[in-house]
Amino acid sequence: MINRVTSPNRKNRFKAIIIGGTGATGKQLLNQLLNNHNCKLVTSIGRRPVFDGKKNDKLMDIVIESLFKLSSTEEYWKNNDVFFNCIGTTRNRAGGAREFINIELGISNEAAKMAANANIPHASLISAKGANHKLWAKDWIHPLLYIKTIGQKEQTIISNFSFNRVSIFKPGMLIRLQGEQTWLEQLSESKGFGLRVDTLASAMIRDAERVKFDPAQESPQFYIGNECIKSSLKL
């Protein structure tokens, strides 16, 4: 049985650290964490300021030249309860297959290492439905490369690090909010398909609250598919 967290409790309040806080889901996650009474402090590490540099008493916004230099941020990882990985890119945005792998897998692994070394008990990761680290893939076949690389990202955080709890969210198509949507996202949302990024963010926070309330829950915990993620908000 999973316990519902209904109101703020000093014992169950948590501190969070996030990478990918300027992305579609990461922005929503940050905003909701800052407005969540169970979260007492959020640290964001990225290449750009979040919220255009606007200040918030609950936000520690750490801007670095490159996420490949996460080792320079060691002090900020300490004394957190949950690490959120919202890193997400594509081959085109990254500049090529190797660059895509270096970002999705390389940065994710380095961040997981920083979190594990800081003894953060809970890691929460955005993956993708269908991700499979065992899949055959060539660099020039991006759909297969994407599925394999994302699968490797989730597999390494499970196998290579000693978190007390790992939560992996595997959504299908994601729908960004108005003003950021592609025509396909607009069409999908109008037909009732896809998962809004703010809903995914809410599910990740609800999961973090449950883990803080009951650390002995099963690990790793997979949330596979949009309907499963939506249903987790009702638990």
Positions of predicted regions on the chain:
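Conserved beta-loop-beta element that borders a ligand/cofactor-binding pocket
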Residues: 153-178
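C-terminal helical subdomain
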Residues: 189-220
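NAD(P)H-binding glycine-rich loop region in Rossmannoid oxidoreductase-like domains
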Residues: 16-17, 41-44, 57-110, 114-117
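Conserved Rossmann-fold NAD(P)-dependent oxidoreductase catalytic core, especially the SDR/UDP-sugar
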Residues: 95-97, 102, 109-149, 160, ...
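SDR active-site strand-loop-helix element
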Residues: 19, 45, 86-87, 123-129, ...
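Short, polar loop motifs at secondary-structure junctions
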Residues: 44-51, 173
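N-terminal Rossmann NAD(P)H-binding glycine-rich loop of SDR-like oxidoreductase domains
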Residues: 3-38
